[in-house]
């Protein structure tokens, strides 16, 4: 390679994530545990720790456009500024705003689709769960390449404005068959946990199968 490392010494494993993301969860049980109505069509919005992008404008537009059975859940993580900003949207019946939570896997199980930046970790976690994704506000470099990969193979979608993103969410929530197809494609393409494979290589000297 350009850095002088022989090609045969490089092993592509994928990004390691916790095994729980590769463990299928029950949507009905997760919704019951999280207090999410069983009949809702749920969009989960996660913006990463930096809270980049038009998160507040997108959340506002989605709450205005979602059908009666639609619901938006926003997880802000440790971004207190974003959390406080979203609370300014007021008490909207189709919006739930959370700060940090350890229940991200359960929220992914409960959701119908997820909006997120195409960062490596979040997208890998969602892909392992088979959760269809819509990407927002990609940053150049690795995020741009992630977006290109996912969209090229129809594993995720994106749009270039708040209005188009909101419309895309509503369109997908109204098409369960399309969401099932995307979910199945993700599960087929993200079967292996990079963390397990890395441990196998380090402890057993075994190369990852391709």
Locate the predicted segments by residue.
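A donor-sugar binding/catalytic signature common to diverse glycosyltransferases
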Residues: 106-145
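Donor nucleotide-sugar binding/catalytic pocket of nucleotide-sugar-dependent glycosyltransferases
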Residues: 1, 6-21
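Short, glycine/polar-rich helix-capping loops at beta-to-alpha or helix-loop-helix junctions
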Residues: 1, 81-86, 122, 141-147
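Short, conserved active-site loop motifs that form the nucleotide-linked donor/cofactor pocket
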Residues: 10, 94-96, 154-156
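C-terminal alpha-helical cap of glycosyltransferases
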Residues: 191-210
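Conserved donor-nucleotide binding/catalytic region of nucleotide-linked donor-dependent transferases
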Residues: 26, 157, 162-163, 170-187, ...
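Donor-nucleotide binding loops and adjacent catalytic segments primarily
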Residues: 27-29, 34-110
């Amino acid at each position: 390679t350009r850095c002088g490392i022989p090609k045969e010494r490089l092993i592509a494993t994928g990004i390691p994530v916790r095994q729980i993301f590769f463990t299928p969860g029950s949507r009905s049980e997760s919704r019951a545990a999280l207090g999410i109505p069983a009949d809702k069509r749920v969009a989960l919005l996660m913006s990463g720790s930096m809270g980049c992008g038009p998160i507040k404008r997108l959340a506002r537009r989605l709450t205005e456009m979602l059908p009666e059975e639609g619901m938006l859940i926003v997880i802000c993580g440790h971004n207190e500024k974003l959390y406080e900003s979203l609370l300014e949207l007021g008490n909207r019946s189709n919006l739930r705003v959370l700060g940090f939570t350890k229940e991200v896997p359960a929220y992914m199980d409960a959701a119908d689709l997820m909006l997120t930046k195409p960062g490596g970790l979040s997208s890998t976690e969602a892909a392992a769960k088979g959760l269809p994704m819509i990407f927002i506000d990609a940053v150049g470099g690795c995020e741009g390449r992630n977006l290109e990969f996912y969209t090229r193979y129809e594993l995720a979608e994106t749009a270039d404005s708040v209005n188009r993103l909101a419309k895309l969410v509503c369109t997908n929530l109204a098409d369960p068959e399309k969401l099932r197809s995307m979910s199945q494609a993700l599960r087929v393409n993200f079967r292996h946990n990079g963390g397990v494979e890395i441990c196998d290589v380090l402890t057993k000297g075994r190369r990852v199968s391709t």
